[in-house]
Amino acid sequence: MKKYQVIIQDILTGIEEHRFKRGEKLPSIRQLSEQYHCSKDTVQKAMLELKYQNKIYAVEKSGYYILEDRDFQDHTVELNPADFQELPYEDFRICLNESLIGRENYLFNYYHQQEGLAELISSVQSLLMDYHVYTKKDQLVITAGSQQALYILTQMETLAGKTEILIENPTYSRMIELIRHQGIPYQTIERDLDGIDLEELESIFQTGKIKFFYTIPRLHNPLGSTYDIATKTAIVKLAKQYDVYIIEDDYLADFDSSHSLPLHYLDTDNRVIYIKSFTPTLFPALRIGAISLPNQLRDSFIKHKSLIDYDTNLIMQKALSLYIDNGMFARNTQHLHHIYHAQWNKIKDCLEKYALNIPYRISKGSVTFQLSKGILSPSIQHMFEKCYYFSGQKADFLQIFFEQDFADKLGQFVRYLNV
């Protein structure tokens, strides 16, 4: 047997015997050449063959990693954020190709399981623990993105007499459209950079009309703010007291380097519905989301889901499961943290030059300013065509996105305020 074949056989045996785990990094080319007393070219030939067999995958300037082991049961490992490349497309493509090997019987044929692929549910359950979301597998449902989950929730009834949905103002624009286009009765509660008025929240809950309170507690878009722990605790307490379900949309959780606690963590009475989206972290075409439901809502949710589709794309579900379990998702998330932190520092540096005396929050790729009513005149709105404006009852807001001309836009904004 030739030397490169010996290397291949040893690594395959290691995978069979679980000595090499999913996501584990192999020894370097240099280390293997010394171990097997051969040239680096010989080792490289072995690596290329293993890569062709979809047993390993390469990370630029890092090395080779095990794509999948035999029992599919191992957990994600800690990896250096510098290992990951610019975008997850290539790694996800590898997982997509691997998901098609030897699984035709249940991926290409009919697989009726509305709650989602069992492997992905297991992967998501483990992943959510990183966000302090502790849920059981039988509470999880895989959906075709968070938008489908929100649509289904708006169709559901909870308790007799409760017909309205409470949303924050401002909030996720697609949620507003979803409610309005269906003619669903709703109320709003003002939110600014400091949070919401808890007394007003209790007053609205007391009406007995609210079935769901839709909120983005962490890295709110467009405000960029996060509820403090006291506010989160109070919201959960009020939801229990007035029998209201909370829809917690945590779609930017992967960008929260502070790892703040979600409402779901504080909930001990099954009042919080937790929604996790993978689109912001990976790419828009991946329309897969996950929702953790209180037991009393799960059956109703699945019945409504069955009216929309038979099941969420099984091949993409399997690919995402592989992507999570072999460590690729963890590396991509860490890489995004690195990019986000670099953006945050650049925005912060620009802001510190002007010593602004107005409230603001830095969020994912933007900064949002809270301004007194009336400052956002038509002239400034024309000046910043690519910025986002929104008006509240007590304040106006301007969101400037981080682009190449961010410093120039910020300078124009400061000059406008000083006129």
Question: Which residues are covered by each model-predicted region?
Answer:
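N-terminal basic, amphipathic alpha-helical segments
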Residues: M1-H112, S122-Q125, S306-N313, Q317, ...
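Conserved core of the PLP fold type I
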Residues: L107-Y242, D254-L266
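General small-molecule cofactor/ligand-binding pocket signal
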Residues: V141, P185-I189, I273, P359, ...
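Active-site PLP attachment segment
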Residues: V59-K61, D267-S300
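Short, polar loop motifs at secondary-structure junctions
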Residues: P170-S173, K386-F390
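Proline-centered loop/turn at the N-terminus of a beta-strand
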Residues: E164, K211, D243-Y245, R271-I273, ...
